[in-house]
A protein has these predicted regions:
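Sec-dependent N-terminal signal peptides
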Residues: 4-14
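Beta-strand elements of well-folded, non-transmembrane domains
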Residues: 112-118, 134
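A solvent-exposed, acidic/Ser-Thr-rich amphipathic alpha-helical stretch
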Residues: 32, 45-99, 109, 124
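A short hydrophobic beta-strand element
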Residues: 102-112
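A short acidic/glycine-rich loop-to-helix N-cap element
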Residues: 118-124, 153-156
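Structural motif
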Residues: 99-100, 137
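Short beta-strand edge/turn micro-motifs at domain boundaries
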Residues: 126-154
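Short, low-complexity N-terminal intrinsically disordered segments enriched in polar/charged residues
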Residues: 13, 17-54, 155-156
Length: 156
C-alpha cells in the first residue's frame, strides 16, 4: 500500500511539474522579445511577422488591427520601407505572467526613435507598452495576441 501511494505521489508530482513553467520558458519568452526588437530594427517585415502565430491578432497604437501572420507582415512592409525605415526600438521592463504551462501574458515597455511623419519630419522619441498573449509551440513561444499603446507625455 505504501508503495502504491508513493508511486501515485510521484505521478502527481510529475504532472504538476510538467505544468509549471520553467526558467527555460522565461528565457524563451525573453528571446522572443529580443527577436521581435531585432526584426524591427532590421526593418525586416518577414522576420518581424515570424514572431507571431499563424492566427495572431495584432492591434497597433492607432487601433489598426490585423489577423494572421501574413497580414501582420503585409501591414508592416510598407511602413518599414517608408516612415519606419530609420527607426530604432528598444525594449525593457519585461514582465511575464504565466497563465498556464503554455500561455503567458507579457508586458514590454518600448522606446522608438527615427520615425517620420508623412511630410518627412522626424517624430520625437516615442514610448509605450506592448501587451502580448504568447503561446508555446514546441520549444518556441510566439505572439498570439498583441496590443500596442503609446504613452502620452504625462505617462512616460
Amino acid at each position: 500500500m505504501i508503495t502504491k501511494l508513493f508511486l501515485i505521489g510521484l505521478l502527481l508530482a510529475g504532472m504538476v511539474s510538467a505544468q509549471t513553467p520553467s526558467t527555460n520558458d522565461e528565457k524563451a519568452i525573453r528571446q522572443l522579445v529580443a527577436d521581435f526588437v531585432e526584426a524591427w530594427n532590421k526593418h525586416d517585415d518577414h522576420a518581424f511577422a515570424e514572431t507571431f502565430t499563424e492566427d495572431a491578432d495584432f492591434t497597433n497604437v492607432r487601433s489598426d488591427s490585423e489577423h494572421g501572420r501574413k497580414a501582420v507582415e503585409d501591414f508592416h512592409a510598407p511602413m518599414f520601407a517608408t516612415r519606419f525605415k530609420n527607426t530604432h526600438q528598444t525594449a525593457d521592463d519585461i514582465k511575464i505572467r504565466f497563465l498556464s504551462s503554455d500561455i503567458a501574458c507579457v508586458d514590454v515597455r518600448w522606446e522608438m526613435t527615427g520615425a517620420l511623419e508623412s511630410d518627412g519630419t522626424t517624430i520625437p522619441i516615442r514610448k509605450g507598452l506592448l501587451n502580448w498573449v504568447v503561446t508555446r509551440h514546441g520549444d518556441r513561444w510566439l505572439i498570439s495576441v498583441m496590443h500596442n499603446q503609446e504613452f502620452t507625455p504625462r505617462k512616460q
